[in-house]
């Protein structure tokens, strides 16, 4: 007989960057593990230093980092942390990205543009990631950018069940804010047993990037409308869509989105909007930090934790969303 046999069991280790430690702690609590102590700081010139306080040799490592602002700093920190795990002889490295940065740059709209979402995936692979676990990617094709397994999680059950439990479903209409979100909105309709409406944007051909008319396809008069989107950044598009629904006789409008990016004028727009409630998950810390009465933040931590457990135990992540 040659070689050495081991009888040790698999070992999971859970790591977090500095971008959103609150979410990391929630996920760790759901898993019943602790976040591995990590020394991380910025040098005077902005370079990032990372060192783990425990050995990761032979462990199945899960590293969570959401790409919130300042996005470039947290992407770079995540890459450095992946590299550190690879050089620490981790058995496997699963990168958890609740919000995947640069996801809107997923194709070339014009010549001489980058496909930055692909670049992020390539950088993670080069750094040493074996698998990516992400929540509600902006487009499905991003799953194909990474040369390895990608587990795509959905916040739809969490968001839809929340809305369905608080409104009269007989008066509910699910609304897609544009043609690109119709497939997701249709799944909401299936889950809630509600009809579908679409806000169609028509642009002024003489003014670049100017939406002049919002046409509503579907009956929204006297209805409680729930606008569904994957992210809200500055809030301009979604608030304009809500205004169009009210103009067409909607009784009330609720806005839901997985990712509350909420940049620039978003706070004022949400505050001054006639929308009664904005519902986000905590993939990003932005929504909770605004502290507006009309903002509700639901925790995505249980969903992420269940997926992590399935990956670690060689189970099925897909089975978590089969009913969807």
From Swiss-Prot:
Cofactor(s) for this UniProt protein: Mg(2+)
One cellular component term from this protein's GO annotations in UniProt: ribose phosphate diphosphokinase complex
Enzyme Commission number(s) of this protein: 2.7.6.1
Catalyzed reactions per annotation: D-ribose 5-phosphate + ATP = 5-phospho-alpha-D-ribose 1-diphosphate + AMP + H(+)
Organism superkingdom: Bacteria
Subcellular location: Cytoplasm
Active-site residue numbers: 201
Coiled-coil annotated residue ranges, if any: none
Positions contributing to Mg(2+) 1 binding: 138
Disulfide pattern: none
Pathway: Metabolic intermediate biosynthesis; 5-phospho-alpha-D-ribose 1-diphosphate biosynthesis; 5-phospho-alpha-D-ribose 1-diphosphate from D-ribose 5-phosphate (route I): step 1/1
SMART domains according to UniProt: Pribosyltran_N
Binding sites annotated in the UniProt record for Mg(2+) 2: 178
Binding, ATP: 45-47, 104-105
Cofactor details (free text): Binds 2 Mg(2+) ions per subunit.
Metal-binding listed as a keyword: yes
Example GO BP: purine nucleotide biosynthetic process
PANTHER family: RIBOSE-PHOSPHATE DIPHOSPHOKINASE FAMILY MEMBER, RIBOSE-PHOSPHATE PYROPHOSPHOKINASE 1, CHLOROPLASTIC
Family: Belongs to the ribose-phosphate pyrophosphokinase family. Class I subfamily.
Oligomer status and interactors: Homohexamer.
UniProt-listed NCBIfam families: PRK01259.1, PRK03092.1, ribP_PPkin
Name of the molecule in the record: Ribose-phosphate pyrophosphokinase
Species whose genome carries this gene: Streptomyces coelicolor (strain ATCC BAA-471 / A3(2) / M145)
């Amino acid at each position: 007989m040659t070689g050495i046999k081991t009888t040790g069991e698999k070992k999971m280790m859970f790591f977090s960057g500095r971008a959103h430690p609150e979410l990391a702690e929630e996920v760790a609590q759901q898993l019943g593990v602790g976040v591995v102590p990590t020394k991380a700081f910025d040098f005077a010139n902005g370079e990032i230093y990372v060192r783990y306080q425990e050995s990761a040799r032979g462990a199945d490592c899960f590293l969570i980092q959401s790409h919130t602002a300042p996005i470039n700093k947290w992407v770079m920190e995540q890459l450095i942390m992946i590299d550190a795990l690879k050089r620490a002889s981790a058995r496997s490295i699963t990168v958890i990205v609740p919000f995947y940065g640069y996801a809107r740059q997923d194709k070339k709209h014009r010549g001489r543009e980058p496909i930055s979402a692909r670049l992020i995936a390539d950088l993670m692979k080069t750094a040493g990631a074996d698998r990516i676990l992400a929540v509600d990617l902006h487009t499905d094709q991003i799953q194909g950018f990474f040369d390895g397994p990608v587990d795509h999680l959905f916040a739809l059950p969490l968001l839809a069940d929340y809305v369905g439990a608080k409104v009269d479903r007989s008066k509910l209409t699910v609304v897609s804010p544009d043609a690109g979100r119709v497939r997701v909105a249709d799944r909401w309709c299936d889950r809630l047993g509600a009809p579908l409406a679409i806000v169609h944007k028509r642009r002024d051909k003489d003014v670049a990037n100017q939406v002049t008319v919002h046409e509503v396809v579907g009956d929204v008069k006297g209805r409680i409308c729930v606008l569904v989107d994957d992210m809200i950044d500055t809030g301009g598009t979604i608030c304009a869509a809500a205004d169009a629904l009210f103009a067409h006789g909607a009784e009330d409008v609720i806005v839901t989105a997985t990712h509350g990016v909420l940049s620039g004028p978003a706070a004022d727009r949400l505050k001054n909007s006639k929308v009664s409630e904005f519902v986000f998950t905590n993939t990003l810390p932005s929504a909770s930090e605004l502290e507006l009465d009309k903002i509700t933040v639901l925790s995505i931590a249980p969903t992420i934790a269940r997926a992590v457990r399935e990956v670690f135990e060689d189970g099925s992540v897909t089975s978590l969303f089969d009913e969807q």
